[in-house]
Regions:
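Conserved Class I S-adenosyl-L-methionine
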Residues: 198, 202-229
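A conserved beta-strand element that flanks and buttresses the S-adenosyl-L-methionine
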Residues: 132
Length: 233
């Protein structure tokens, strides 16, 4: 079998460890905007998938699940504001460290952070026009993934869009070489490589998602997992 032929489901990212180095973790959160700008392609997702679903004059709501340091919801809030589109974003993460970092950053109009699980919002009967996540799926085990997708279906009124890394030897090699001179003193490079090892191929993901979800390849090394309620499809 070739390199990365199977998911490294037992590999653990350093920043997910409760006893990880706090200084490296804080530096990792500070460096996320740069690495996500370079590899995650969220501006394209906003332009092609999110913005067409937003009402030009509002109201619009978006839930970002597993928001980490908060750079992705911050970026989406700023893009919508630049386009003159009213958008209220709720960003949630159960990790106390991630939440503390996110709320320590300068405030952005229309964006609020909460330390919470998606299941808690489902229990509260909350709904949002759009539900998103970034680089979250590969962190989850099978039961957690099933729960996330169920929660997403219940929470979204127009669409749920999960953007994640797509496993490939080329992605691994390029990320390894491309990040080698950069991101010192953080978990970016080591955890990024672990993320690629843990991530799904598009075919693997398509085989396990429930009916109603679609998986599409996003170049160069990502895929989008999308759900549209039938009443809004």
């Amino acid at each position: 079998m070739g390199f990365l032929a199977e998911r490294a489901v037992d590999a653990v990212e350093e920043m997910d460890r409760p006893d990880c180095d706090e200084r490296k973790l804080a530096r990792t959160y500070r460096q996320f905007p740069l690495i996500n700008w370079a590899v995650s392609g969220w501006h394209g997702v906003y332009r092609r998938q999110l913005r067409p679903l937003l009402r030009p004059n509002g109201p619009n709501t978006l839930l970002d699940i597993g928001s980490g340091g908060g750079d992705i919801p911050r970026a989406i809030a700023k893009w919508a504001a630049r386009d003159g589109i009213p958008l209220v974003i709720t960003a949630i993460d159960p990790d106390e460290r991630a939440h503390a970092f996110a709320v320590s950053r300068p405030k952005v109009d229309g964006l609020v952070f909460h330390r919470a699980l998606s299941s808690e919002l489902v229990a509260e009967g909350r709904t949002f026009d759009l539900v998103t996540s970034n680089h979250l799926l590969h962190h989850l085990d099978a039961a957690q993934l099933t729960a996330l997708l169920s929660d997403s279906q219940q929470l979204c009124a127009r669409a749920a869009i999960h953007n994640d890394i797509r496993r490939s030897p080329v992605a691994y090699g390029l990320f390894s070489v491309g990040t080698l001179p950069f991101f010192p003193g953080s978990f970016i490079r080591a955890d990024g490589l672990t993320s690629i090892r843990r991530s799904y191929t598009t075919h693997e993901l398509a085989r396990i998602v429930p009916p109603g979800w679609t998986v599409s390849t996003k170049r160069p090394f990502h895929h989008l997992l999308t759900y549209r309620p039938q009443s809004d499809a």
